[in-house]
Swiss-Prot record:
The gene is HR4. One of its GO terms (cellular component) is membrane. Ecotypes susceptible to Erysiphe cichoracearum, such as cv. Columbia, are lacking RPW8.1 and RPW8.2 but contain in place HR4. This is RPW8-like protein 4. The chain crosses the membrane at residues 7-29. It comes from Arabidopsis thaliana. It is found in: Membrane.
Amino acid sequence: MPIAELAVIKTVGGPLIAAALGVGAQVIYDGFRKGKDTSIINRLGRTMESISPVRDRIGKLSNVEGKPFREVHESLTRLLEDAKSIIEKYWKLRWSRHVCRKYRYIKKLESIELELVRVAREIQVHQWTDIKEMKAIQVHQWTDIKEMKAIQVDQWTDIKEMKAIQVDQWIDIKEMKAIQVDQWTDIKEMKAQISEKHNK
């Protein structure tokens, strides 16, 4: 191709090529953006699915435990409802050209996802703390049970010792009675001897 023709192509075709490349780049970027947005929404959907049962259990506990659980339940409910609402709005705009609005929705969803993850981690921390506290309580209870058993053993030992003392006392009483009987027999014999001497 002659140099002059190349120059014409460069001069006239340059803007067209640039425009074509720009459109191609925009298409690629839009595809990437939609893929990324869809990935965020799918990930958030999985997070919502995993947290919803936890939210329901906390709701049941809030009826028993009171304010702390009720506040967590309300916070999770609000976040899940906000996420659902924004996802619905995003899907309505998915194929439109409202790029800025879609971008804002995605940013809100990312923020909600982070907040949901944070709350879930706090719940896990509280659960772990509760488990450790329950284990500590169980250890104390087991210690108390062992101490009570030791006290019962000591009491049983004391009872056996008291019974042994009572047996010894009973033996002593029987021996004293036997001695008294012997003494009484001796006294009667002495009286009989004195009476015989007196009669003679």
